[in-house]
Amino acid sequence: MKNKLITPIISILFASSVFTACQKGDLLSNPNVAAETSTVPASLILNHITATLQRGEDPIISDVWKYDQYFVSNYSYYFGSNFYNWSNTGHTYDIVKYANKMEEQAFKQFGNKTNVYYALSKFFKAHSFVWLSDRVGDIPMYQAGDVTILEPKYDSQKEVFKNSLNMLDTANTILGALISSANANTKVDAAGDIYGMTYSQWQKVINTYKLRVLISLSKRADDNADLNVKAQFAAIISNPTKYPIMTANSDNMVYTYNSAYNQYPVNRAGYSPYGYAANVNKTVLDLLTTNKDPRTFAFAVPAPAQLTAGKAVSDFTAYVGADVNIPQATLSNNSTAGMYSFINWNRYFSSAAGANCEPYIFLGYPEMCFNIAEAANRGWIPGTVAADWYLKGINASLGVYKLTQGQSFVIGNLDGTKPNMGTATIDITTFLAQPGVVYAGDNASGLTQILNQKYIAFFSNSGFQSFYNQRRTGVPAFSQGGAGIGTPNNKIPVRWLYPQDEINFNNANLKSALTTQFGGTDDVNSLMWLVK
């Protein structure tokens, strides 16, 4: 980790003054980089952190959406392979470094550790540690970011989650005190925070994220009593004054795009004309069409061969997903023959500003509803009705995609060069009445319904959360076992290998952690503590 801890704090893009002559030492100093001892506005550091919090999980074009089994590439030149051939993960220690610096600079500016930047720093660090631990297992945490320790020791995954939950609680407490003495609806930092959220919204985000972390610990809720997983979850739900959470989609933490300098990823990458290279995955499309889910029309277009055979664009059986088990060459041939549905070009490929699709949700209200429903189904929060939160989650997800009862919905085309295919009438009432959607009760069947609907609600948002939920619960059943998976055993991996930086600069501690967890081998098929 040596190379991560000695870099300067932040590059200043435009120098505030011009030097007209060289002075002694100038050749050793970069005038465009702030020294470690400089005072840098906390707002500037916040801007950097919020701009980089999304870790390569751009909608549609990133591999995550293939790994989550939402879409399938039938043409490697544009959308790569579908192989789950994971290797070394990236890391989030850069976020930790900047968060520590934001705390330092905020203390210089405000003279206390109860300011809003200090609170947000706790959230960013907790999120960063959980992000990496979710991928590999044990990680350096307590010693990470200490510039005097170049080879930090590893902390157990349990300790990582325990300490992250404590940091989230600290962040909530600080924000609660600030909100009591200030306007809750005031933006935290209009210049620095690219999410543009208020004090109240940030507090809701932090507590909503804590619910995500707690539900991710469901397999450890009974055999690690000291974590108090169920009690912590119940405390948030039972005390909304102390722990406010999201109440609507308007509280979603969203990353928005524009056509000028932050284009929607498909357009930014130049893939807009190539919608025909991306099919919708069978895993998600089968869940949708089986229950006459109107989100089918938002995500996909009918398989051309089904229309040629005489089916209407509103016929759910005309929507056919591609199976990732199938080798890509076969997928390509079948796609050319019109056998599969394609991603809705009108929605996801047509606008450089992403004007026709939903914004990217980093953390959202629909997920929160399903997390609460899951906890209620599991008996964590007596008195909370799982069915109510399940239905709230479904309706919130429909709202994200702007679907309303009786709406005439235009079915798009394949690549923007052809006429639209027709229209379908959105029928939410019929969808909600389907036997597979009506809540089956606080039992295993009801839990499966909650998890399936959460999975659908994650379409094109929230990064790897679909994968993590599926890894933890087995729901929905992911396609695997075929040659299209691209691993030696044609099975989906359950973790990543450790970052290359750890191998290069912290090898002794890494080897010790591997011995403790996995018998000494860094294996993508080994189960971590979180999901054993």
Predicted segment positions?
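Bacterial Sec-dependent N-terminal signal peptides
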Residues: M1-P31
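Membrane-proximal, proline-rich intrinsically disordered regions
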Residues: C22-Y75, N82-N85, G90-Y93, K101, ...
